[in-house]
Amino acid sequence: MTLVKRVNLEPAFVIHTRAFKETSLLVDLFTKNLGRINVVAKGARRPKSPLRSVLTPASLLAISFSGKSELKNLNACELLNHYSISMPLSFNSIVYVNELLIKATEKEDPHVEIFNQYQSLCEGLSGKKERIEIEVLLRSFELILLQELGYGIDLSFESISGNKIKPKDKYMFDPSLGFNKVQTDSIKSNGIFLGKDILNFSSGDLTEEDSRLASKKIMRLALDYHLGNKSLNIRKYLSKE
């Protein structure tokens, strides 16, 4: 683990806050170059603290902090951009992704591409968005997250034979292996998907409801497998799960 003495103007997003002592906050931050870190924002809960309005979700910050231990001291914080995410589904999506980052990543383990994708997600969720658009953004982020963590999913080829996935064939998805063709008349069984839906997911085309549902199930199976016993609490609050 990297022990940081002092860092200035590091790009970061707030992914979780909680009260600390009488007037301070403990803040989980996802930074561009240092990964996920924890800081103490002293006095941030005071009514006149300038930190109150900037330590919020979907805000791109430039932070300065210091400390050798795992818990750093936040010395300064500048708001670079705030992405207005007001629609309930979009806001819940950010809450979901924030919890996913906490559960899936290790502290002080840098992932620049995940940070960039997170920023793109915030940009994409800002303003009015249709459910389909939001689901495409979420599935894209989940795929990149797993890929960057070393758990990428091949949506084009079978894992054992190496054959191309074909639209009319059916495939069993094993999160530890990938997709492999099966002989069955049903795709209702958990873990079995139609090739067409897998390929649509691969191309980012989720206009068909069956493909959207399949992509969501694939990612849930993969994430649950790699998270192990770290269940995502936000799921029970999301609508139409």
Describe these PLM feature segments:
Residues 1-25, 30-241:
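Non-catalytic alpha-helical scaffolds and adjoining flexible linkers that form interface surfaces
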